[in-house]
Amino acid sequence: MKLPKEGDFITIQSYKHDGSLHRTWRDTMVLKTTENAVIGVNDHTLVTESDGRRWVTREPAIVYFHKKFWFNIIAMIRDNGVSYYCNLASPYIMDQEALKYIDYDLDVKVFADGEKKLLDVDEYELHKQKMGYSSDIDYILKENVKILVDWINNGKGPFSQSYINIWYKRYLELKNR
């Protein structure tokens, strides 16, 4: 599979553990790809839910996916600062159709003022039983929550303001070419 290049548009597909399609983002612009990571941007991107509902993202958001970590990061660039929505999810795969990952319900929200919240714990516990998440997956996800919180607390990667500035600036350059 050939990696997408800077400026290419890709589709992102989120699945549930049982294999059902959860959510699709159309036309995410690729800012950078490496052997292990994809950085992109969604800006007024069409999102389709599994029940067919559709909506459009409101503000630019830098998205970060990695092949070694069990989370992905959405940095939403708003007037009051950058807020983050982090999905606990499988490492991504990429094929001809889309960038794909399994969403494991748990989310970490980071508000512009730095406050953090772990979300959807009840949904995670319900789906863990219903879809049969293994004890290995449960352990991996809980360890990756710790890694993610460490990244947040230490301003690592997407949680660094300079990272956001660099990639948002690059997006604006590509958008205005």
From Swiss-Prot:
Its EC number is 3.6.1.15, 3.6.1.6. Pfam families: DUF402. Its cofactor is Mg(2+). The keyword Hydrolase applies. It catalyses: a ribonucleoside 5'-triphosphate + H2O = a ribonucleoside 5'-diphosphate + phosphate + H(+); a ribonucleoside 5'-diphosphate + H2O = a ribonucleoside 5'-phosphate + phosphate + H(+). Mg(2+) 1 binds at residues 87, 103, 107. It is an enzyme of class 3 (hydrolase). InterPro entries: DUF402, FomD-like_sf, Ntdp-like, SA1684. Gene3D superfamilies: FomD-like. The active site is at 23 (proton donor). The keyword Hydrolase applies. It comes from the Bacteria. Mg(2+) 2 binds at residues 105, 107, 120, 123. GO terms for molecular function: magnesium ion binding; nucleoside diphosphate phosphatase activity; ribonucleoside triphosphate phosphatase activity. Keywords: Hydrolase, Magnesium, Metal-binding. Belongs to the Ntdp family. NCBIfam families: PRK13662.1. Has nucleoside phosphatase activity towards nucleoside triphosphates and nucleoside diphosphates. This is Nucleoside triphosphate/diphosphate phosphatase. It comes from Streptococcus mutans serotype c (strain ATCC 700610 / UA159).
